[in-house]
A protein has these predicted regions:
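Hydrophobic alpha-helical transmembrane segments
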Residues: 1-66, 90, 106, 198-201, ...
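Alpha-helical transmembrane segments and their helix-entry boundary regions
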Residues: 13-14, 85, 153-155, 259
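Short amphipathic alpha-helical coupling elements at transmembrane boundaries
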Residues: 2-6, 73-77, 235-238
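Helix-loop-helix units of permease transmembrane domains in multi-pass membrane transporters
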Residues: 62-92
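Select subsegments of transmembrane alpha-helices in polytopic membrane proteins
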Residues: 12-17, 92-99, 182
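Helix-loop interface residues and adjacent transmembrane-helix termini in multi-pass membrane transporters
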Residues: 8, 79, 147-148, 253
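Terminal transmembrane helical anchor/hairpin motif
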Residues: 31-38, 154-262
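Secretory targeting signals
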Residues: 24-29, 35-41, 50, 92-158, ...
């Protein structure tokens, strides 16, 4: 309740909803009403890039502000578990996002009223996928916000992370698939992961152990069976791509794998 109240007392909530709905309204008018096309799912697919811009703004202060003001120490000693506190913050952001989604649910009905033939099953399946995609982006933004005390850093890193996530399917197509290239990229990625854990735990011993054991395992596996690395990172990144899983929802397919993934 506190987090949700702060969104509307600081105008962030109103600005988010206004910008979110105005952009969707413009796309709906241009594509569905003016164009006379009933594929509302394609409209949602076209504006999913909004998450890259809007979600970092919503989540940048959600945990970073607590870290900056040192009020996170009070949260640790509260009678409520940390899990419940984080879930409370998460559901506060999701509730704000959900208000916008509820408004969007009216769009297919309005389009039908104005003579645009909308396939409601596809439209509402896409809305479900759009909502789940948004909640996944919110979770990423919250995690990044928890790693820093600076709202600006949280916002910028969230923006870059979400942008890369949305571009993963394009990026993987440009990566070399040879075993040695994939192995080197995995080794570098592991070092980045170790640095993230170090930032969270601030423990040099854990950092060194993770880095040494991980790097040793990566190169030993390559020496034993290098063929395992052929296209390995490419396949992993394709699996992690958020936006590609939205495609099934656009086709009216409620893919349980995608639902669980989000």
């Amino acid at each position: 309740k506190k987090e949700l109240r702060q969104y509307f007392s600081s105008m962030i909530g109103f600005v988010f909803l206004a910008f979110f709905l105005v952009i969707i309204g413009i796309y709906t008018w241009a594509y569905n009403l003016s164009g006379g096309i009933g594929n509302f799912e394609e409209t949602l697919g076209s504006i999913s890039f909004l998450f890259v811009i809007l979600i970092p703004i919503l989540t940048m202060r959600i945990v970073a502000e607590e870290n900056h003001q040192k009020t996170n120490q009070l949260l640790y000693t509260a009678p409520v578990s940390i899990t419940k506190i984080i879930l409370g913050k998460f559901f506060a952001v999701v509730s704000l996002f959900g208000i916008g989604i509820l408004v969007i649910c009216l769009y297919p009905l309005i389009l039908n009223m104005y003579g645009t033939d909308v396939r409601l099953s596809l439209a509402y399946s896409s809305i479900i996928g759009f909502f789940l995609l948004g909640t996944a982006c919110i979770a990423i933004g919250m995690f990044i916000s928890s790693l820093t005390e600076s709202q600006v850093i949280a916002s910028v890193v969230s923006f870059i992370t979400l942008l890369l996530t949305f571009l993963l399917s394009n990026i993987t197509g440009m990566l070399p698939t040879e075993a040695i290239s994939q192995c080197v990229m995995i080794a570098v990625l592991w070092l980045v992961i170790c640095l993230v854990f170090y930032h969270m735990m601030n423990n040099v011993t854990v950092l060194v152990m993770m880095a040494v054991i991980g790097e040793a395992a990566i190169w030993i596996i390559y020496a034993v069976k290098s063929s395992l690395y052929e296209s390995l990172l490419t396949n992993i990144l394709n699996t992690l791509a958020l936006s590609t899983r939205f495609d099934d929802f656009s086709l009216g397919i409620l893919n349980y794998d995608a639902i669980v993934y989000y």
